[in-house]
């Protein structure tokens, strides 16, 4: 159904903003800092942002000095990007934005984020540390290496640059 369809308001209960994490990434984003930024700006959505050399695989954000995102463009053609700051796949979004979405297929990045940014309702928080989008075979291996290097596993053992599950030989 796309991320937007899966987040459609009919599936949500509770109060306050919704934390969304893309399932194919590893990062060191500080969610508490993201919440503080979201509350301080009063934004409808607050995105974690990461700087990359080639942003063509990602959504690109134009962040101003007050922490607001003025433009959002999903997967720009190489050479057309206006920034190297990308959506790092962890964001807070207000429930009223989601309540307007149906369960049909929606792309948050193509249908929701650009309008929120243009309307002045989107903030961003750039972070440092590590970020790996594990959407390709090579980046999946890189993500595993980042997890090993940063102790991001809760079972098994590490030998050299390899991780082994609890019952593996």
Predicted regions located by residue number:
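Short, well-ordered turn and helix-capping elements at secondary-structure junctions
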Residues: 49-50, 73-77, 162, 168
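Conserved beta-loop-beta/alpha segment of the NTase-like Rossmann-fold superfamily
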Residues: 1-65, 101-102
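Short glycine- and hydrophobic/aromatic-rich loop-to-beta-strand nucleating segment
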Residues: 88-93
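Residues immediately flanking
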Residues: 23, 94-95
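Short, flexible, basic/aromatic active-site loop/helix in glycosyltransferases
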Residues: 63-81
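Glycine-rich "substrate-gating" loop/helix at the edge of Rossmann-like oxidoreductase active sites
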Residues: 1, 80, 128-132
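Left-handed beta-helix
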Residues: 33, 40-41, 66-68, 95-169
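A generic fold-level signal
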Residues: 13, 55-56, 64, 83-85, ...
